[in-house]
Curated annotation (Swiss-Prot):
It comes from Mus musculus. Its main location: membrane. It is a multi-pass membrane protein. The lineage of its organism: Eukaryota, Metazoa, Chordata, Craniata, Vertebrata. GO terms for molecular function: glutamate-gated calcium ion channel activity; kainate selective glutamate receptor activity; L-glutamate transmembrane transporter activity. It is found in: Cell membrane; Postsynaptic cell membrane. This is Glutamate receptor ionotropic, kainate 1. Homotetramer or heterotetramer of pore-forming glutamate receptor subunits. Tetramers may be formed by the dimerization of dimers. Can form functional heteromeric receptors with GRIK4 and GRIK5. Interacts with KLHL17.
Length: 836
């Protein structure tokens, strides 16, 4: 007799035997014979592309369950796979109805939202569980009860991103999203500015065009160093290549990717760039069981035909594949718990639901399992995944490393900060070239003196260069020293903008500043400082007078050479102007013989030499006994006297300081002593920390000192100090010229004896001199000569000629007598000019 057969002999058939056989056929046989449970999968494919990774994971999970009989010992899991085109919701609905007609316990897929909604509607009507593994935004009035989604809740991921931003203390964040769903996934972060001190700038990647270089260029120009990318792993791989091309793969940037497949990307090109790259990971690779399953997956994938370039590591299991693997296992666990799960054929047009559908759906939502993506539990109300863990990973030189964990209940827990990474910090600078900014300041940084031309770092020497050289030898980095362009240390203006070396560091034009830069609270807000190599405080530094005796020309020291030259030129200029105006104005001509009012001879005291004598006498504060009479000449004299008053006063004050400097004792013992006096001028280095200290100080003594320093210019007494007096002098001379012209016109109109001829009547025949000669009683000679006033020098020459002619005629006619003879003494002729 073969094993497993039942022999019933004739005559032994009784009623009890019949009931026993019926019980065996109805209860014992179904439990011992294998059952078949069919599930359906709808996957989207693209023409001429390999099989979807979700479909491969679907088959891999079914095969793994059938091989391991511990989960479903008496059930064989089979599947039906249907492939559709992308975004074809009608084809998705038709394929779903075909699978339901075959009799499936659950439907998996598709991925995209339009097709998912169509399949979900059918499953909800026929009460068949719908298993989803992609992110899907639930509607407000969600009435879909027959589905679960293994993808983490978008609200939880958004909170995780916000917690990470707060942990890093980012004040400005740039969010770059691929499509509109990214704004929904990050809504917690977008609403953060209303609750936290965070500024968010939102940008969108170009749709359809993978060239993001223009966008990256704007971000680089705008100094956007903290960037969050919400995109797929395919887009992330392409963006990383363009970031490297744009020169933005440096330690100054921090990129965060919301994709859960950052660990699966090939990041070999960026490991040693120093860039900060962070992301999430859902796979629990720390579990040995998970690691073994991932290793089996990798072995199968490496044996498969090569896939096109996707930016992923070879044979790696993505999050999509892991979620599909866990989804199949969740259905298998629920079916194992269900006793007598009978799957019937369903017709979409009949709208007759599956009788065991609600019970099976509840079993799936109640299932608990630690899968590839960690602990899996569902919310019974909306079917979303809850209470999951997200690993925080960061790119290091060794690859991606776990630096923390985020849980939907406990929040963020960073573990990287507690690790001793001193060795990594030391090694991170090896074989790197740093741009070092500095400033010329003896003895810290100086130009090296050499007969040969020097280039690069050899141009400089000093304490800071020696310190930098020692650090380079210890840490193994290279450096390129550059002087700060504006020659300043770094201070903040009223607009909050920085200059000097601080600005070079903020703008990342330099990696390091090695200089005698003071550590202040304001500077520490924007840049980081190392341990100080020297501890100093604010000190009063003043020059001790040297012991040299005054030289022969020490009296010239109070004024700069430019001032001395301008004073001499001003003296010459004023003298010439005074001479011309005195000749031009009629009020400077006077009668030398006041006893003879009928005399037509007039004289002028302001010859060229007398004008120079007047200017020199006023400059020496002595006078010259020459007093101007006309208003124009008095204006010239008054302006010149005012000019000499300022010059001589300034000279006297500075001369006393120069001569007594050796006898001065130190009157400054504290800041209060310095603030109380005004004789000794003082200041600080422009845009340095000392200047900023006095500028921002609220202490009355320091405020008074800052007011004094800001009102003084750190220069000698030169043109910029007393140059205004030269402007006053020039304005006075111009005014005197106009006044002289007015005086001449006024006198011309008033004198009715002057003949006016033509248009030149104001300037011609100003003087009309009459000389009458009387002979004897019977003879008389009258000579009348009119002088033309074409030019002043011509007039003076004619006057001298007439004088000689009169003398000659008086010798030829002895009987002649003069009624009026105008003669000038020879000595007066030399000093004064006479017009007859």
């Amino acid at each position: 007799m073969e094993r497993g057969t039942v022999l019933i002999q004739p005559g032994l058939w009784t009623r009890d035997t019949s009931w026993t056989l019926l019980y065996f056929l109805c209860y014992i046989l179904p439990q011992t014979s294998p059952q078949v449970l069919r599930i359906g999968g709808i996957f989207e494919t693209v023409e001429n592309e390999p099989v979807n990774v979700e479909e491969l994971a679907f088959k891999f999970a079914v095969t793994s369950i059938n091989r391991n009989r511990t989960l479903m010992p008496n059930t064989t899991l089979t599947y039906d796979i249907q492939r559709i085109n992308l975004f074809d919701s009608f084809e998705a609905s038709r394929r779903a109805c075909d699978q339901l007609a075959l009799g499936v316990a659950a439907l998996f897929g598709p991925s995209h939202s339009s097709s998912v909604s169509a399949v979900q509607s059918i499953c909800n009507a026929l009460e068949v569980p719908h298993i989803q593994t992609r992110w899907k935004h639930p509607s407000v009035d969600n009435r879909d009860l027959f589905y679960i989604n293994l993808y983490p809740d978008y609200a939880a991921i958004s909170r995780a991103v916000l917690d990470l931003v707060l942990y890093y203390n980012w004040k400005t964040v740039t969010v770059v999203y691929e499509d509109s769903t990214g704004l929904i996934r990050l809504q917690e972060l977008i609403k953060a500015p209303s609750r936290y001190n965070i500024k968010i700038k939102i940008r969108q990647l170009p749709s359809g065009n993978k060239d993001a270089k223009p966008l990256l260029k704007e971000m680089k120009k705008g100094k956007e160093f903290y960037v969050i990318f919400d995109c797929s792993h395919e887009t992330a791989a392409e963006i990383l290549k363009q970031i490297l091309f744009m020169g933005m793969m440096t330690e100054y940037y921090h990129y965060f990717f919301t994709t859960l497949d950052l660990f699966a990307l090939d990041l070999e090109l960026y490991r040693y760039s120093g860039v900060n790259m962070t992301g999430f990971r859902l796979l629990n690779i720390d579990n040995p069981h998970v690691s073994s399953i991932i290793e089996k997956w990798s072995m199968e994938r490496l044996q498969a035909p090569p896939r096109p370039e996707t930016g992923l590591l070879d044979g790696v299991m993505t999050t999509e594949a892991a979620l599909m693997y866990d989804a199949v296992y969740m259905v298998a666990i629920a079916s194992h718990r269900a006793s007598q799960l009978t799957v019937s054929s369903l017709q979409c047009h009949r709208h007759k639901p599956w009788r065991l559908g609600p019970r099976f759906m509840n079993l799936i939502k109640e299932a608990r399992w630690d899968g590839l993506t960690g602990r899996i539990t569902f919310n019974k109300t909306d079917g979303l995944r809850k209470d999951f863990d997200l690993d925080i990973i960061s790119l290091k030189e060794e690859g991606t490393e776990k630096i923390g964990i985020w849980n939907s209940n406990s929040g963020l827990n960073m573990t990287d900060g507690n690790r001793d990474r001193s060795n990594n910090i030391t090694d991170s600078l090896a074989n790197r070239t740093l741009i070092v900014t500095t400033i010329l300041e003896e003895p810290y940084v100086m130009y090296r003196k050499s007969d040969k031309p020097l280039y690069g770092n050899d141009r400089f020497e000093g304490y800071c260069l020696d310190l930098l050289k020692e650090l380079s030898n210890i840490l193994g980095f290279l450096y390129d020293v550059k002087l700060v362009p504006d020659g300043k240390y770094g201070a903040q203006n009223d607009k909050g903008e920085w200059n000097g070396m601080v600005k070079e560091l903020i703008d990342h034009r330099a990696d390091l500043a090695v200089a005698p830069l003071t550590i202040t609270y304001v500077r520490e807000k924007v840049i980081d400082f190392s341990k100080p190599f020297m501890t100093l405080g604010i000190s009063i530094l003043y020059r001790k007078p040297n012991g040299t005796n005054p030289g022969v020309f020490s009296f010239l020291n109070p004024l700069s050479p430019d001032i001395w030259m301008y004073v001499l030129l001003a003296c010459l200029g004023v003298s010439c102007v005074l001479f011309v105006i005195a000749r031009f104005t009629p009020y400077e001509w006077y009668n030398p013989h006041p006893c003879n009012p009928d005399s037509d001879v007039v004289e002028n005291n302001f010859t060229l030499l007398n004008s120079f004598w007047f200017g020199v006498g006023a400059l020496m504060q002595q006078g010259s006994e020459l007093m101007p009479k006309a208003l124009s000449t008095r204006i010239v004299g008054g302006i010149w006297w005012f000019f000499t008053l300022i010059i001589i006063s300034s000279y006297t004050a500075n001369l006393a300081a120069f001569l007594t400097v050796e006898r001065m004792e130190s009157p400054i013992d504290s800041a209060d002593d310095l603030a109380k006096q005004t004789k000794i001028e003082y200041g600080a280095v422009r845009d340095g920390s000392t200047m900023t200290f006095f500028k921002k100080s609220k202490i009355s003594t320091y405020e008074k000192m800052w007011a004094f320093m800001s009102s003084r210019q750190p220069s000698a007494l030169g043109v910029e100090n007393i140059g205004g007096i030269f402007i006053v002098l020039a304005a006075g001379l111009v005014l005197s010229v106009f006044v002289a012209i007015g005086e001449f016109i006024y006198k011309s109109r008033k004198n009715n004896d002057i003949e006016q001829k033509g248009k030149s009547s104001r300037l011609r025949f100003y003087f009309r001199n009459k000389v009458r000669f009387h002979g004897s009683k019977t003879e008389s000679l009258g000579v009348e000569k009119c002088l033309s006033f074409n030019a002043i020098m011509e007039e003076l020459g004619i006057s001298l000629k007439n004088q000689k002619k009169i003398k000659k005629k008086s010798r030829t006619k002895g009987k002649s007598s003069f009624t009026s003879i105008l003669t000038c003494h020879q000595r007066r002729t030399q000093r004064k000019e006479t017009v007859a």
